[in-house]
Amino acid sequence: MARAPLGVLLLLGLLGRGVGKNEELRLYHHLFNNYDPGSRPVREPEDTVTISLKVTLTNLISLNEKEETLTTSVWIGIDWQDYRLNYSKDDFGGIETLRVPSELVWLPEIVLENNIDGQFGVAYDANVLVYEGGSVTWLPPAIYRSVCAVEVTYFPFDWQNCSLIFRSQTYNAEEVEFTFAVDNDGKTINKIDIDTEAYTENGEWAIDFCPGVIRRHHGGATDGPGETDVIYSLIIRRKPLFYVINIIVPCVLISGLVLLAYFLPAQAGGQKCTVSINVLLAQTVFLFLIAQKIPETSLSVPLLGRFLIFVMVVATLIVMNCVIVLNVSQRTPTTHAMSPRLRHVLLELLPRLLGSPPPPEAPRAASPPRRASSVGLLLRAEELILKKPRSELVFEGQRHRQGTWTAAFCQSLGAAAPEVRCCVDAVNFVAESTRDQEATGEEVSDWVRMGNALDNICFWAALVLFSVGSSLIFLGAYFNRVPDLPYAPCIQP
């Protein structure tokens, strides 16, 4: 007994469903009998079909800088009026919306003009919604790959302006007129609409502005009806954190190592050149990585590339400086003569200006033990040669100091033994050689000090050049910001 009411209800439901289906089928036959999807929905040939357009961005997939290609995922909302599809829901069981395949209805054939892969149309032919009163809505999804001219001047602190240009493929400006859609509040949606709930944020790019504009042009024919383009500008700003962590910070640290070459001794020119050249090679690797990322263009040089070239120039100058300092430090008095002016500037003036400590003074040697005077040695020699007692020789020496000479003493000096003369000559030679070696050592030490002074000067010059140059290069990126355009942000906070 309990199953009977249940069966009756099920039968009534099926009958009701069948009646509803018949009404929809009847509406379909009513609308599409003698309907031609190839003709425009106008009563007169000179009438214009008004197309309301709305573009909703769901995902900014990527921007390939190398190929200058922007890949986006969008929904294209298209609304228009077709008087041939006009009906009243009261005549067809209260049906407000009829869904029909898109190939059965006239379409404005909107395509993306600046696509790069030849896919002008949409990705999926969704059904067309026909509403009471002849209003038609088509909302197909599409994945577009469009051309985007990449400006690499401030890479990786750059922003790009990529455009999506829509137009009707077969209809001119007199046959089809484009307008922007309006929201529920009656405001015109003259920008790319972004649904924050469905939008997937890109990890590399942030969208700042996405205004739209409708432009009518003649396409080269001044007397023709012209064409209408709907241009959406997608102004995106790069998020530079990835490049700062993986390229800029390692590059700055490696470039700073070239300054450590100045902390090596001036005579270690080979080691200093090795350090500088290794840094130069590392910078070349970073420059190669950047060249693989940016497009092959000669219009501008990227900011990071300018920084690497600048640091490579500094490293090259440091290598040249190391060679010059090594050449100066290895000079000797036999090959080069030091001018007094150069000595004054590099050894006296510049150390005082740079605050360098003066060279340490050589410790004074302790006074040697008192030796016998040369007069005593001569007296002993005369005593042996002349066979005279020491008292007489001393007396003759006193007379010599008083200005009187004896012929015997002069004859004794003339007849001095050859052995004594050889010893005196040897002593004089040793003394003269010692004086020459001391003078040569002092001059060699002056050349080494001059090399150290040049090294010190070049260190401060390289430090100032590296710091100021790097700051000026990256300071340009700070001022490269998206201009304050008179548009509302795409993504409202």
Curated annotation (Swiss-Prot):
Disulfide bonds join 148-162. Changing residue 285 to A: In CMS4A; slow-channel mutation; increases gating equilibrium constant by 25-fold, owing to increased opening rate and decreased closing rate; no effect on the choline dissociation rate constant. Keywords: Cell membrane, Congenital myasthenic syndrome, Disease variant, Disulfide bond, Glycoprotein, Ion channel, Ion transport, Ligand-gated ion channel, Membrane, Postsynaptic cell membrane, Receptor, Signal, Synapse, Transmembrane, Transmembrane helix, Transport. It is a multi-pass membrane protein. GO terms for biological process: acetylcholine receptor signaling pathway; chemical synaptic transmission; membrane depolarization; monoatomic ion transmembrane transport; muscle contraction; signal transduction; synaptic transmission, cholinergic. Glycans are attached at residues 86, 161. It catalyses: K(+)(in) = K(+)(out); Na(+)(in) = Na(+)(out). Residues 21-239, 292-306, 481-493 are extracellular. It is found in: Postsynaptic cell membrane; Cell membrane. SUPFAM superfamilies: Neurotransmitter-gated ion-channel transmembrane pore, Nicotinic receptor ligand binding domain-like. Changing residue 141 to L: In CMS4B; marked decrease in rate of AChR channel opening; reduction in frequency of open channel state and resistance to desensitization by ACh. After binding acetylcholine, the AChR responds by an extensive change in conformation that affects all subunits and leads to opening of an ion-conducting channel across the plasma membrane. PANTHER family: NEUROTRANSMITTER GATED ION CHANNEL (PTHR18945). This is Acetylcholine receptor subunit epsilon. It comes from Homo sapiens (Human).
